[in-house]
């Protein structure tokens, strides 16, 4: 299978690694992680950014002189109205017209609210935003988000920050099969093994923050995740052998040497 470039909202990306910018030990580690990951899309919570002066913001000022696609998120929003308001403020500040819709009402699980996420996605897409909604691994909901105008859909592998990996690979596979927009797995991953699995299932990319930022060595983990994305994608394109119940000899019995 021939690979195709990843294109979202009219922008072609060479990296399939979407990287979060929070929770790093310090800005120097963050910058080194960004460098080795070769990520082109960086995400951050809008509520953590000084929208009055984005260029002087404590987060963004460390990225000056570099070219990235910013994917601000609406983390902290409890409903569609809050998410829409936050997105409009971000765009008005000149920050970005890309937006990751993230709406959670349960602080214990941080699972996305499906109804509010769908409402916000439809409204923001109609207003010209490039919308990437974070959602659950529900194939029907993911399709509805696509139909509502999402430029890409971002199902979670597991609840945010849990490191549990891909809890429902069957659903994720169905989501990929049915999608006509890129599928970016977001949330719940913990290791390079999880990333390879996501990519082998056909995901177009992976968004990570905690698995890298909170690793014992974030820079090494960023490099591991980068290679895992590449390996998983290559394995998906190569096509794995089918699983079956019984063994098949790699050399047929007729090849035995007879005396």
Swiss-Prot record:
<feature type="active site" description="Schiff-base intermediate with DXP">
    <location>
        <position position="100"/>
    </location>
</feature>
<dbReference type="InterPro" id="IPR013785">
    <property type="entry name" value="Aldolase_TIM"/>
</dbReference>
<keyword id="KW-0704">Schiff base</keyword>
<comment type="function">
    <text>Catalyzes the rearrangement of 1-deoxy-D-xylulose 5-phosphate (DXP) to produce the thiazole phosphate moiety of thiamine. Sulfur is provided by the thiocarboxylate moiety of the carrier protein ThiS. In vitro, sulfur can be provided by H(2)S.</text>
</comment>
<comment type="similarity">
    <text>Belongs to the ThiG family.</text>
</comment>
<protein>
    <recommendedName>
        <fullName>Thiazole synthase</fullName>
        <ecNumber>2.8.1.10</ecNumber>
    </recommendedName>
</protein>
<dbReference type="InterPro" id="IPR008867">
    <property type="entry name" value="ThiG"/>
</dbReference>
<comment type="subunit">
    <text>Homotetramer. Forms heterodimers with either ThiH or ThiS.</text>
</comment>
<keyword id="KW-0784">Thiamine biosynthesis</keyword>
<dbReference type="Pfam" id="PF05690">
    <property type="entry name" value="ThiG"/>
</dbReference>
<feature type="binding site">
    <location>
        <position position="161"/>
    </location>
    <ligand>
        <name>1-deoxy-D-xylulose 5-phosphate</name>
    </ligand>
</feature>
<comment type="pathway">
    <text>Cofactor biosynthesis; thiamine diphosphate biosynthesis.</text>
</comment>
<feature type="binding site">
    <location>
        <begin position="187"/>
        <end position="188"/>
    </location>
    <ligand>
        <name>1-deoxy-D-xylulose 5-phosphate</name>
    </ligand>
</feature>
<dbReference type="GO" id="GO:0005737">
    <property type="term" value="C:cytoplasm"/>
</dbReference>
<feature type="binding site">
    <location>
        <begin position="209"/>
        <end position="210"/>
    </location>
    <ligand>
        <name>1-deoxy-D-xylulose 5-phosphate</name>
    </ligand>
</feature>
<dbReference type="InterPro" id="IPR033983">
    <property type="entry name" value="Thiazole_synthase_ThiG"/>
</dbReference>
<keyword id="KW-0808">Transferase</keyword>
<dbReference type="GO" id="GO:0009229">
    <property type="term" value="P:thiamine diphosphate biosynthetic process"/>
</dbReference>
<dbReference type="GO" id="GO:1990107">
    <property type="term" value="F:thiazole synthase activity"/>
</dbReference>
<keyword id="KW-0963">Cytoplasm</keyword>
